[in-house]
C-alpha cells in the first residue's frame, strides 16, 4: 500500500512515524516546499517523488494535511489525479469539505483529536469509504463516525470552539497573573479543581497557541463563517485576542 502526503508538518510527520509497516510506503514531494520543510523531508527517509501530481497518481490513500486556507486549492489542483481514498485532515468547515467532495472521488473527512505529537492521538473519520481506513487502528485508534462526509468536520469545529476559546482565556488570565507576580499561585489554585497536571497542560496549550496563532486564527475564521447564525461571542473574542 502507498500513502501519499500533502504537507509535511506535525500531522504528516506524526502519521509517518506512527504508521510503520513493511507493507506500507509513504511518498511525498519537495515541489514548492520551503527550505526548512525540504530539509525535514530529506531527513525523514520518506520516498520523494518529483511532483505532487505524481504523488496523487500513485497513492492508494492520499492525505491532505496542509492548512485551512490551502485545503480546497490542493483538492482542486490535485484531487482529480487521486485514484484511491482522499483523506482530508485539515481543520476546515463542513462547507469547505463539501466543496472538496466535488473535486475528488472517494473523499473521507478526517480529524486527529488529541495532542498531535503524542503517542496516542485518535483519528476520527466519516464518509462512504471510511470503513476502508479502519485498518489504521493497528497503528493509532481510529473511529468511524458515519458514512456522511462533513460529520467529522462539524465535530472538530465544535471542539475548536471550546479549545481555542479556553486557550485565549488562559493566555489572558495568565498574563494578568504574571503582571501581579502571581502566576505560580494562579495555576496552583486552579489545579485544586482542575487536576494536578493542569499547570503543565495549560502552559503547553498557551505555548502551542502563541506559536501557531496564524493557523489557529484561520480555523476560528472558518468557524465564524460556518456557524454565522449562532451566538459566537466567545469565539469572536478569541479571534480578536489571537490577532493582536
What function would you assign to each model-found segment?
Residues 1-57, 116:
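NAD(P)+-binding Rossmann beta1-loop-alpha1 motif at the extreme N-terminus of oxidoreductases
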Residues 192-244:
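Interdomain hinge/lid region at the active-site interface
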Residues 173:
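Cationic-aromatic interfacial patches
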Residues 25, 47, 85, 106, ...:
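Conserved beta-strand segments of alpha/beta enzyme cores
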Residues 92-163:
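Rossmann-fold dinucleotide-binding core
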Residues 52-54, 60-63, 68-122:
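Rossmann-like NAD(P)(H) cofactor-binding subdomain of soluble oxidoreductases
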Residues 182-195:
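Small-residue-rich helix-loop
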Amino acid at each position: 500500500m502507498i500513502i501519499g502526503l500533502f504537507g509535511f508538518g506535525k500531522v504528516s510527520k506524526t502519521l509517518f512515524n506512527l504508521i510503520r509497516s513493511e507493507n506500507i510506503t509513504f511518498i511525498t514531494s519537495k515541489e514548492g516546499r520551503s527550505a526548512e520543510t525540504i530539509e525535514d523531508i530529506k531527513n525523514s527517509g520518506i520516498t520523494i517523488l518529483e511532483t505532487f501530481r505524481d504523488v496523487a497518481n500513485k497513492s492508494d490513500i492520499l492525505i491532505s494535511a496542509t492548512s485551512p486556507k490551502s485545503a480546497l486549492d490542493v483538492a482542486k489542483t490535485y484531487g482529480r489525479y487521486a485514484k484511491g481514498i482522499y483523506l482530508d485532515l485539515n481543520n476546515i468547515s463542513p462547507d469547505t469539505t463539501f466543496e472538496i467532495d466535488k473535486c475528488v472521488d472517494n473523499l473521507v473527512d478526517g480529524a486527529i483529536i488529541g495532542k498531535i505529537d503524542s503517542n496516542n492521538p485518535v483519528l476520527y473519520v466519516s464518509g462512504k469509504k471510511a470503513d476502508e481506513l479502519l485498518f489504521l487502528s493497528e497503528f493509532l485508534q481510529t473511529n468511524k463516525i458515519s458514512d456522511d462526509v462533513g460529520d467529522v468536520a462539524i465535530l472538530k469545529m465544535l471542539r475548536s470552539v471550546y479549545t481555542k476559546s479556553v486557550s485565549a482565556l488562559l493566555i489572558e488570565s495568565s498574563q494578568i497573573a504574571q503582571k501581579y507576580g502571581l502566576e505560580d499561585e494562579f495555576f496552583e489554585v486552579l489545579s485544586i479543581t482542575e487536576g494536578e497536571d493542569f499547570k503543565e497542560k495549560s502552559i503547553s496549550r498557551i505555548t502551542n497557541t502563541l506559536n501557531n496563532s496564524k493557523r489557529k486564527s484561520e480555523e476560528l475564521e472558518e468557524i465564524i463563517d460556518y456557524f454565522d447564525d449562532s451566538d459566537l461571542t466567545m469565539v469572536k473574542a478569541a479571534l480578536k485576542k489571537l490577532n493582536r
